[in-house]
From Swiss-Prot:
MF term (GO), any: 4-hydroxy-3-methylbut-2-enyl-diphosphate synthase activity (flavodoxin)
Functional description taken from the UniProt entry: Converts 2C-methyl-D-erythritol 2,4-cyclodiphosphate (ME-2,4cPP) into 1-hydroxy-2-methyl-2-(E)-butenyl 4-diphosphate.
Domain of life: Bacteria
Source species: Sodalis glossinidius (strain morsitans)
Family according to the record: Belongs to the IspG family.
Listed pathway(s): Isoprenoid biosynthesis; isopentenyl diphosphate biosynthesis via DXP pathway; isopentenyl diphosphate from 1-deoxy-D-xylulose 5-phosphate: step 5/6
Listed EC numbers: 1.17.7.3
Catalytic activity: (2E)-4-hydroxy-3-methylbut-2-enyl diphosphate + oxidized [flavodoxin] + H2O + 2 H(+) = 2-C-methyl-D-erythritol 2,4-cyclic diphosphate + reduced [flavodoxin]
Alphabetically ordered keywords of this record: 4Fe-4S, Iron, Iron-sulfur, Isoprene biosynthesis, Metal-binding, Oxidoreductase
Name of the protein: 4-hydroxy-3-methylbut-2-en-1-yl diphosphate synthase (flavodoxin)
Positions with a binding annotation for [4Fe-4S] cluster: 270, 273, 305, 312
C-alpha cells in the first residue's frame, strides 16, 4: 500500500537473456550461480531447480573444461531458467556451449585469445542471438593496469571494462552487458558510477566475494542499494559464501526494500519489547517459512502492541496489532471486527494471507481453510 519510491532508472539498451528482457526499463532481473561441480549433472540440475522455486530469473554456470561443456548440454535440457555460461581462456568452450543452446556467454574478450579467436566467438554469438556479459573483477585486473594504478581503483576497473567494450565495438557487436565487481563496497559503487556515465549498455550489479550469509548480505545491501537508488543496474547477483538460494532471497529483499520490484510478502515486524502481547518473533519466523510459496506482492505488518501497530496496519495489505489475549486485525488499512486469538495467531494469519493472495492473484486460487477463533 506504500507508494513506489521515486527512482528514475538509467536508460540502457535492450537485450534478451533467453526470454528474460534486460535493460530498457525492464524489471531488474535477479541472478545466482551454481556452486556444484558442473560435471555432476544431477547435483547441478537439482540446485538450479531449487533456485527456480524461489524465483531466480537467470542462473550462471561455470564451464571451465570441455567435459563441463558436455555436462552443460545435459543440464540445459532439464531446466527452464536461462543459463549463462561462465568461460575463461578457452574460446572453444564458448563455441561448444553456443551449439548447446546457452542463453548468455560470460567472457572477457581480451582473455580468450588472439583477434581471430575473439572474432569467432563474437560471430558465433551474433549468429545465434546470444548476448555476452563482460565481467571485470578487481581481483583479476590485467597486470599492466595493476602496475599503472598500483592497486584496484575505480579508474582501473573502468579502463579494463572499456578495453573489452572497445573490442566488441570494433566487431560491431552491441548485444552485451557489463559488470565491474569488487569486494570493497565503495570501490564497486564508484566503478559502476563511472561506467554508467560512459556506456548505455545494461549493467549487471554485484559486490563480489562479499562474504558469508550475514556479512555478504549487508555489504550487498549497502552497495547495491546505493546504486539501485540512483537508478543504476539492470540485473544483479548477491555473491554469498552460502546456499545460492539465499542469494536469490536477499536479492529480492533488496529490491522489495527499495520498492523497485515486488515478489512475495514484505513482512513489517517490530523487534519486540516487554509490551508485546504475543510472540512476534516466533510468528514472523514461522510465517516466513510457511509462506515462501506466495509470490503475490503484499505488505503484512505484525506488531506486538498498540503503540505502533495501528499506524503500520493502516498502510499494510494485512496487519495485526497485539492486544490482551486477542489481537486486532486489519485488511487494506481498515480494522476488522474479527480479532485473532493470540494462541492461534500463526495459523489464523497464514489462512488470511493465503486468502488475500488468492483474491489478488488467480495463480493462488486454491482452497483456503480459515481457522476459527
Amino acid at each position: 500500500m506504500h507508494n513506489s519510491a521515486p527512482i528514475t532508472r538509467r536508460k540502457s539498451k535492450r537485450i534478451y537473456v533467453g526470454k528474460v528482457l534486460v535493460g530498457d526499463g525492464a524489471p531488474i532481473a535477479v541472478q545466482s550461480m551454481t556452486n556444484t561441480c558442473t560435471t555432476d549433472v544431477a547435483a547441478t540440475v537439482q540446485q538450479i531447480q531449487a533456485l527456480e522455486r524461489v524465483g531466480v530469473d537467470i542462473v550462471r554456470v561455470s564451464v571451465p573444461t570441455m567435459d563441463a561443456a558436455e555436462a552443460f548440454k545435459l543440464i540445459k535440457q532439464q531446466v527452464a531458467v536461462p543459463l549463462v555460461a561462465d568461460i575463461h581462456f578457452d574460446y572453444r568452450i564458448a563455441l561448444k556451449v553456443a551449439e548447446y543452446g546457452v542463453d548468455c556467454l560470460r567472457i572477457n574478450p581480451g582473455n580468450i585469445g588472439n583477434e581471430g579467436r575473439i572474432r569467432s566467438v563474437v560471430d558465433c554469438a551474433r549468429d545465434n542471438n546470444i548476448p555476452i556479459r563482460i565481467g571485470v573483477n578487481a581481483g583479476s585486473l590485467e597486470r599492466d593496469l595493476q602496475e599503472k594504478y598500483g592497486e584496484p581503483t575505480p579508474e582501473a576497473l573502468l579502463e579494463s571494462a572499456m578495453r573489452h567494450v572497445d573490442i566488441l565495438d570494433r566487431l560491431n557487436f552491441d548485444t552485451f552487458k557489463v559488470s565491474v565487481k569488487a569486494s570493497d563496497v565503495f570501490l564497486a559503487v564508484q566503478s559502476y558510477r563511472l561506467l554508467a556515465s560512459r556506456i548505455d549498455q545494461p549493467l549487471h550489479l554485484g559486490i563480489t566475494e562479499a562474504g558469508g550469509a550475514r556479512s555478504g548480505a549487508v555489504k550487498s545491501a549497502i552497495g547495491l542499494g546505493l546504486l539501485l537508488s540512483e537508478g543504476i543496474g539492470d540485473t544483479l547477483r548477491i555473491s554469498l559464501a552460502a546456499d545460492p538460494v539465499e542469494e536469490v532471497k536477499v536479492g529480492f529483499d533488496i529490491l522489495k526494500s527499495l520498492r523497485i520490484r515486488a515478489r512475495g510478502i514484505n513482512f513489517i515486524a517490530c523487534p519486540t519489547c516487554s509490551r508485546q502481547e504475543f510472540d512476534v518473533i516466533g510468528t514472523v519466523n514461522a510465517l516466513e517459512q510457511r509462506l515462501e510459496d506466495i509470490v503475490t506482492p503484499m505488505d503484512v505488518s505484525i506488531i506486538g502492541c498498540v503503540v505502533n501497530g495501528p499506524g503500520e496496519a493502516l498502510v499494510s495489505t494485512l496487519g495485526v496489532t497485539g492486544g490482551h489475549n486477542k489481537s486486532g486485525y486489519y485488511e487494506d488499512g481498515v480494522r476488522q471486527r474479527e480479532r485473532f486469538d493470540n494462541e492461534l495467531m500463526i495459523d489464523q494469519l497464514e489462512a488470511r494471507i493465503r486468502a488475500k493472495a488468492a483474491m489478488l492473484d488467480e495463480n493462488n486460487r486454491i482452497t483456503v481453510n480459515l481457522i476459527e477463533k
